[in-house]
């Protein structure tokens, strides 16, 4: 299952505040109707307080979606990996082709998993 095989259906707002926007992109594979949910987060600023607020919003949102949620970085680096792991995402695929022609790692937050969050740095 690669993002390259799927077409965009809709964006669903997870939360938005003055420093962060988080949306869930719903994608569908035309050949069989399979759905893939991809999380997108844009941070205008970074701080431990903003991270805590994002985690609080995520904790309210995640139980409402009974499906796996995927994530991939625009630019893969250790900072992105650390950030996404704060929300329970784990590596799934080291290199998957994406719709824009780039190859990126895919991370997953499994549905109904015991959510484990790393402690927030102060």
Regions found by a protein language model. Give the residues of each.
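Conserved acetyl-CoA binding element of GNAT-fold acetyltransferases
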Residues: 32-46, 72
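Conserved beta-strand-loop-alpha-helix junction that forms the acyl-donor binding cleft
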Residues: 16, 70-85, 97-99
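Short beta-strand micro-motifs in enzyme catalytic cores
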Residues: 13, 35-37, 101-108
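A conserved beta-strand-loop-helix scaffold within acyl/acetyltransferase catalytic domains
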Residues: 22-33
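Conserved acetyl-CoA-binding loop-helix of GNAT-fold acetyltransferases
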Residues: 47-62, 82, 86
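Conserved catalytic-core motifs of GNAT/GCN5-like acyltransferases
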Residues: 90-105
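Short intrinsically disordered terminal tails
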Residues: 1, 115-122
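A short helix-loop-beta-strand connector motif used in the catalytic cores of GNAT acetyltransferases and
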Residues: 3-20, 65-66
């Amino acid at each position: 299952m690669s993002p390259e095989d799927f077409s965009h259906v809709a964006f669903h707002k997870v939360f938005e505040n003055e420093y962060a926007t988080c949306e869930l992109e719903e994608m569908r594979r035309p050949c069989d109707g399979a759905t893939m949910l991809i999380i997108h987060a844009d941070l205008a600023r970074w701080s431990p307080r903003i991270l805590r607020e994002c985690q609080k919003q995520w904790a309210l949102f995640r139980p409402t979606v009974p499906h796996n949620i995927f994530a991939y970085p625009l630019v893969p680096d250790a900072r992105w990996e650390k950030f996404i792991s704060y929300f329970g995402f784990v590596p799934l695929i080291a290199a998957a082709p994406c719709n824009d022609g780039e190859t990126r790692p895919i991370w997953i937050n499994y549905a109904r998993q015991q959510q484990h969050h790393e402690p927030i740095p102060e």
